[in-house]
Amino acid sequence: MKRRTFIQKGFLAAIPLAGIAPPRWLLRPSAQVMTVNGPITIGELGTVLPHEHILVDFIGADRVSPKRYHQDEVFDVMLPYLEDARRHGVRTFVDCTPEWIGRDAGLLKRLSDASGMHMVTNTGYYGAAGEKYLPPYAYTETAEQLAERWIAEWHDGIGDTGIKPGFIKTGVDGHPLSATQRKLIRAAALTHLQTGLTIFVHTGDGRAALEELAILTDTGAAPDAWVWTHAQSEPDRALHIQAAEAGGWVAFDGLYPQLVDRYVAFLRDLKARRLLHRALISHDAGWYEVGKPDGGRVRPYVSLFQDLIPALKKAGFTTAERRQLFETNPAEALAVRIREKHRSQNT
């Protein structure tokens, strides 16, 4: 079966989110997301946290290892935070910890089963932070060779777990990107064009975001295959608007209670320009940090519900607009479908 036929026709029929008028493409049978327990339709996603973390290990690619922590301890520490998020209405949790920083697909599956929450993991390599988290072969292999590694995880699963990634996670520092960071972005685009997985890029600044977008589109991927992660770090709102107007996803995903007013202002600006459908919101919270006693201080996943949603209501955002932000947008962003330049189905 051809890869496009598999992606577009082999998935279960989509179930529209209740009370929402979805984009036309969501009515097609290709609207599916890959979780650690297998594929589900977008109608099963519910409220989504599109950028969070369960476990991280900042030791570096040369020393990171699952032997540095006890999975049972991490499970016991983190499960109550997921249960708290579940009580607040979260149905789907996107874990953005990549390989070489502590990605543990088996742990995520255990937590998914115990919490009743859908969880999504990733493939890809993280080139930010001075490229501390890259394996040596990231410098010697071509973009095509790196993409082959990531595509293999989509086809065969991560390690011996059988668990498949639901998106691509990579990362870069500020503009200008290094040669290796540019290669990672190209590898991500090549992987997308073979798998339909969306590309989440930790991004140092707005000019780096536009550089990423140029690489992706030059490689043949459409802008809506790309998420500008940590866009809140860029103070120039014009760059947010430029990326959104191009069709990319602009993610304000470092929510703290003290930043709520800034997030409301960002969303109000997008709404005024009819670009609310390009926004993603999350906390970048958690996590169990390997090497710290008891995993260190864990930040809960609930400020969105306790702080941001009440502020959005006060600012005049309707129920439909809030569902757009926390259900429809992440469902569209995560849906597995190949988005080619000049053939984007985004509406």
Features from the language model and the residues they span:
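Mid-to-C-terminal alpha-helical segments outside catalytic/metal-binding sites
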Residues: 7-22, 26, 31-37, 302-347
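Twin-arginine (Tat) signal peptide motif
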Residues: 1-7
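Distinct, well-ordered alpha-helical segments
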Residues: 106-108, 178-183, 207-220, 237-244, ...
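Short acidic/histidine-rich active-site segments
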Residues: 253-254, 275-298
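Alpha-helical scaffold segments that flank or form the walls of functional sites
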Residues: 46-50, 60-118, 144-163
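Active-site gating/metal-coordination segments in enzymes
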Residues: 110-113, 118-195, 242, 249, ...
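Divalent metal-coordination and catalytic microenvironments
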Residues: 51, 93, 192, 250, ...
